[in-house]
């Protein structure tokens, strides 16, 4: 089972407080491991604040200042000092890795310089850090009923308010979060 372009949705039984009520978009999954971005936990800095700290040379005028007020997300505990941009495939950015026909992920600064300008991707989110698992580690967690999985829906990533993404992902599975138990078991 390849989980690339899927969501991991934390079950209420999740013991790790970092991942409780998390939704993680899986960018890469193979026998060597898994890499994803948590899409529903903001950090205490706006995109503009982060860009100001980086001091990018921005050759284009800012024409969409409202897009710079969006929060930066906490993508996960690995490399949490590094920015990751999940974006629609509008243009080719340096080092972008295509996840699907519609989405790519990059750590390249060239895309950051386009944010707020006419050259920005149609849809994007910025996260600090990523969530990672060694080969077989995620599969073990799945067998322990720690996560639910479903095919990713870009509307959850880009169009659903951040606090509602966990609930929305569960609803796509036909699950009412109020009906989930924090107890786990196997039949």
UniProtKB/Swiss-Prot annotation:
- Record NCBIfam families: PRK00228.1-1
Show which residues constitute the signal peptide: none
Provide a GO CC annotation, any one: cytosol
Q: Which Pfam families match?
A: DUF179
Q: Which HAMAP family match?
A: UPF0301
User: Would you identify the family this protein belongs to, as annotated?
Assistant: Belongs to the UPF0301 (AlgH) family.
Q: Which InterPro entries does this chain map to?
A: AlgH-like (IPR003774)
* Entry protein name: UPF0301 protein VF_0434
